[in-house]
């Protein structure tokens, strides 16, 4: 596994110089960098969770599986502190480039946690159309006291593509989160 090259003159393989330069865990011995070979374990770990999710909910589409995985991924605190301590757009771009969407929490993927609930819907939305969803949010969510509250929304879709254009995506999605008296009142405001 990993990157190798076949040297024809000597009839052997070569790995030196083909790896990725990374920090060395044994930097105390005076070698701060080392060459690492192979591939990340992130892809097979996420694929394993995705396969378990597909087995548990076989009616899910691949887009719903992607959305559930993405919504339960988080950046490790140490990564956020070192790559985005200023909490700005450039730091978030750095995090995305270096560690993607973060680690997927397998526990939250399969069952709601004490302080976290996952609601999902799968639907087809026509072009230039809207779809409204009503989220039942308990009164405790709005309760008094200083604490962080969050509603996370994840959208996943397979866009129509235009292969003859540089901007190949034909579809764009957006959402608006609205607190209203009823679904009917919100629908009237958007139509």
Give the label of every model feature segment.
Residues 90-180:
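Secreted peptidase-domain scaffold signal
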Residues 42-56:
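Short, small-residue alpha-helix embedded
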Residues 57-83:
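An often Trp-containing, charged/polar helix-loop segment at the C-terminal end
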Residues 1-39, 43:
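Extracellular S/T/G-rich loop segment that most often corresponds to the catalytic His/Ser-adjacent loop
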Residues 61, 85-87, 140-141:
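Core alpha/beta structural scaffold of self-assembling particle/tube/pore-forming proteins
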Residues 1-8, 54-57, 73-77:
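Structural signal for hydrophobic packing residues in well-ordered secondary-structure cores
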Residues 186-191:
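Noncatalytic accessory or regulatory domains flanking protease catalytic cores in secreted, cell-surface
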Residues 11-23, 66-72, 168-181:
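Active/binding-pocket-proximal capping segment
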